[in-house]
Amino acid sequence: MAFSKNILDSLPPLISKQIFEGFFGFEKENIRVDSRGKLALTPHPRELGEKTSHPYITTDFSESQIEIITPPLPSIAESLGFLETLHDLVSIELKDEYLWPQSAPPILPEREEDIPIAHFGGEFREQEEYRLQLAKIYGRKRQMFSGIHFNISLPERFLELLHEEGKQEQPFAEFREDIYMKTVRNFLRHRWFLICLLGASPVIHKSYRKHCIDMLSPFAKDAYHFPYATSIRNNICGYRNTQDFHLNYSTLTDYRESLQELVEKKVLRDIRENYAPIRIKTTTDPKRINHLEIRLLDLNPFFKTGVNPLHAEIIHIFLIYCLLCPEETSFTSKEQETANRNQEQAATEGLNPGAIICDADGNEQRLDKQLAHCLQEIQQTVSPHLPPEYRAGMEELERLVQNQASRPTDTLLKEIKQEGFTEWHMKQALKFLKKSHDEQFIFHGLRDMELSTQLLLRRAALRGVSFEIMDRQENFVCLEQAGKREYVMQASRTSLDNYISVLSMENKVITKKILDQAGINTPKGRSYSSPSEALADYPYYRGRAIVIKPKSTNFGIGITIIKENNRHDFFAQGIAQAFKHEATVLIENFSSGKEYRFFIVNDQVVGILHRVPANVTGDGTSSVQVLVTEKNKNPLRGRGYRTPLEKIKLEETEEMFLASQGYSFATVPAKDQRIYLRENSNISTGGDSIDFTDKVPQSYKDIAVRAAQALQVKITGLDMMIDSLEEDAAEDNFSIIELNFNPAIHIHCHPYIGKNRHLDDKILDALGFTGAEEAGEKA
């Protein structure tokens, strides 16, 4: 083809860097194991949905082998974030089981037939039959290797620009295909480079196939290895076809025909049996390449996702190198044989600097020299077009080549030697599980979005509901499953509520009038349309506890509480503050009691929360400062509204409030003595959220539902003041302050004290999104 890096060099730098755009996705396999590191023999968990219809969670060869799949996303970071979120969701749902973090299998049953093949019934029975055939050909133990598949598509607009700028005579479709095919050929030629640097399966447990164990040397307790191996998964003992075969990579048609010929000759049972290190993938149009699937990557057991983000960048850099580097010959059978031998050498001898690798001309070279040469080629070819965000990846690549001790295999061998194969990997599995629990409110890759939205999308992903982020800043998403589509904003603004109901909740005057008409108690008060009008009524409010607030407010903005209303200047300040935010202001009697947030979905109270100001409880020996530091270690606490609770601050405001009580940061509270650092109970200032769903009498819940029905709302957060939970609701012992049209769900899902009320699930239920299993039955 008439394509070289010279064409790329002729483009403006800002345009040439677009070559690093595209879409990215990951497929990851993990074996489920028990607490001893033995293969779990239990069925695929029902909590993970139906494996045949779930878009993100399924099984691979074995019923015990979970596969998680991300959708194509426009950056590696987003795709890895989605992968990590799926990993967290799966890990948390497992009961007394763990995700094995290593590509090499865990402790396997002695008899191969005891390894459960993934079960598929009904119309999907063929998938199980196919796996049974693979078991006969390869054995079940060989199929228990797991790995990472990295899916990458090249940027379409860049390819179009490249075609136009290069004044190519061939049609764009042919030009595009040529670029993809050239990239594949060069990847296959040089794949040994990635295996040598990124391999992470150097050791195998003794329960693996006896034929392979007999070839290996003892390494650690119950573990064996090739002395210089980087990736047993990629060598003669690993996950590969029974024989090497050569495909025609000239064009997509040639490739497909050569693959089909192997099926017709019974070399392969099915084209799915092509275990090549890279696959060419099409979708609805079989004549058009959609993306490339890189399949040679081991799980990196030092990372929860199995992927070092910098190594993902390295793979992308390497793929761009394969696109750009010159290609002098077609990928002949002889070249393919050389590439296969190089793969075997890299996988089996990759830690031996003196191992032999054949260069592009077929000449034998020392491995260390060829690594350095390949790095230099990549730097010269790719660096001029490297975006700033990929510089760390390039620097990591340089470290891996120049310092063998920095490679995952080298570090892994030291850990296994010291602790044991099973012991070390189980320690990693437990560490990752704890991290998953600690971060169970995060959608990785979407951490800039509201926490409530992240929670909703997490549960949507677990249910197999696909989603699109329509407006990231507005937290506006589209949910879709089995032909059903719903739009949601800020997790709780949905199609279930009509526009007039939202307006009624937004306008506090209207809210009060509607509730009054329904005979539901609200604070007595008046509305004012000018500061002078409100100030004129000061004599009426003097000496009474009042609340001054804008007509339309949220998050407590513009609200002033005056409990002893004896100073006109304080009253005037409150009026001025409220009118800064709204043209109409309410002045109401202050309602006594404690404030409770009722969350209502479809005429049901699904959560009730009480908020307590920032505080610490003494242990008799620690100062307030130490107690705050310790309390802030809770993984639910963070900064910037990215966690369910905020860290308690030790600043001037807290210092002044402590001083007003006769305390300081150095005060040592008595055991069980509670000291408050703030007067307001906002979560945003370090307050505690306490679940009261099961403690509030039913009479108050009934009133809350009546209030929601009066405004004809299906999802709302209702704030109610209650004098005492020891009494049932009466005419004078409660008051509804307001109803909110976009209430946060995260405070109910992860309270400081109490259980998760799963409001994310409740909203998905209300919208009609079932689990993946039920969706599959309906589809």
Swiss-Prot record:
Residues bound to Mg(2+) 1: 719, 738
Residues that hold Mn(2+) 2 according to the record: 738, 740
Reactions catalysed: L-cysteine + L-glutamate + ATP = gamma-L-glutamyl-L-cysteine + ADP + phosphate + H(+); gamma-L-glutamyl-L-cysteine + glycine + ATP = glutathione + ADP + phosphate + H(+)
Enzyme's top EC category: ligase
Metal-binding in keyword set: yes
The protein's role, per its UniProt record: Synthesizes glutathione from L-glutamate and L-cysteine via gamma-L-glutamyl-L-cysteine.
Protein name in UniProt: Glutathione biosynthesis bifunctional protein GshAB
